[in-house]
C-alpha cells in the first residue's frame, strides 16, 4: 500500500484495495462484505488482484504468454488492478531475502518474465528497472554482485563524466537559445548485465553505460537538439 500511495500516487480507493489485496484470498471475507464495508469499487479491485494471484506461472514460453494475456485482460477492466499487483510484487521483491533460495528464484523468474515486461508496457520504467535488478540479484547472484561492485568502485569517475557531459549539453543549448531540461542517468545493472553476458564483454568494454534525455517544448526544437547532440558527440 505504501508503494501505491507514495510512489504511484493513486487514489484513496486504490490505497484501501492495496491494504486489503490479500483479504479475499487469505480470509473468509467476501466481495459482498468488502463492498458493504468499504465500496463496490474497492471490492472489485481486491477481487481483481485476487484473480491475478491465482494465475499459475509456468516455464514454457506459450504458457507465459497466456499468463500475460490474462493480466492484460484484467488491465482492460480497471488499470488499477494491475498497478496494485505490480506494487505488491515490487514489495515482495524488496523483501525477498527472507524467503528460501528456491522461492527467491521462482518469484524472480516470474517477475522477470511477467511483471517487468508489463511495467515496461505501462511506461513505468523506474519500477521496471528495479524489478529487473532485484530479479537478477537472485537469478544470478554472482553476476549481479560483480556488476554492482564494479559500478560502486567507479561511481566517482562515472559521476564526474556524467556531470561534464550534462554541463556541455546545457551550455551549448543555451548558446543556441533553446529552452530545455537535461537529465542524465547511469544504465541500471540488469541492462549492463545483458550487454556484458550476451556479448561476452567486460564492463570496460560496454560503452553505453549512460543515458541522457533532453526535454524541449516543440518538435522543431527536438530536431534542432538532435543536430546539436550529433555535432557535440559524433554518432
What does each model-identified segment do?
Residues 84-87:
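Hydrophobic transmembrane helix module of multi-pass membrane transport proteins
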Residues 15, 43-50, 128, 132:
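Short, well-structured alpha-helical segments
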Residues 2-7, 27, 31, 54-71, ...:
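Nucleic-acid processing machinery
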Residues 10-20, 41, 45, 81, ...:
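Alpha-helical scaffolds flanking conserved acidic
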Residues 23, 45, 49-54, 64, ...:
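Transcription initiation cofactors for RNA polymerase, centered on bacterial
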Residues 21-48, 124:
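Hydrophobic or amphipathic alpha-helical targeting/insertion segments
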Amino acid at each position: 500500500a505504501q508503494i501505491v500511495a507514495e510512489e504511484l500516487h493513486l487514489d484513496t480507493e486504490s490505497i484501501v484495495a492495496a491494504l486489503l489485496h490479500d483479504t479475499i484470498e487469505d480470509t473468509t471475507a467476501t466481495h459482498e462484505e468488502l463492498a458493504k464495508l468499504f465500496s463496490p469499487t474497492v471490492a472489485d479491485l481486491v477481487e481483481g488482484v485476487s484473480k491475478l494471484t491465482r494465475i499459475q506461472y509456468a516455464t514454457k514460453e506459450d504458457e507465459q504468454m497466456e499468463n500475460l494475456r490474462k493480466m492484460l485482460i484484467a488491465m482492460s477492466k480497471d488499470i488499477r488492478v494491475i498497478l496494485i499487483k505490480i506494487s505488491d510484487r515490487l514489495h515482495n521483491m524488496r523483501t525477498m531475502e527472507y524467503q528460501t533460495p528456491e522461492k527467491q528464484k521462482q518469484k524472480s523468474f516470474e517477475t522477470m518474465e511477467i511483471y517487468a515486461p508489463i511495467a515496461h508496457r505501462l511506461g513505468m520504467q523506474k519500477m521496471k528497472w528495479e524489478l529487473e535488478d532485484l530479479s537478477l540479484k537472485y537469478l544470478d547472484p554472482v553476476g549481479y554482485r560483480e556488476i554492482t561492485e564494479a559500478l560502486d568502485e567507479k561511481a566517482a569517475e562515472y559521476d564526474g563524466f556524467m556531470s561534464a557531459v550534462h554541463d556541455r549539453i546545457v551550455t551549448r543549448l543555451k548558446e543556441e537559445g533553446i529552452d530545455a531540461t537535461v537529465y542524465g542517468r547511469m544504465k541500471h545493472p540488469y541492462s549492463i548485465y545483458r550487454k556484458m553476458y550476451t556479448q561476452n564483454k567486460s564492463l570496460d568494454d560496454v560503452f553505453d553505460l549512460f543515458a541522457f534525455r533532453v526535454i524541449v517544448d516543440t518538435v522543431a526544437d527536438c530536431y534542432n537538439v538532435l543536430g546539436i547532440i550529433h555535432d557535440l558527440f559524433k554518432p
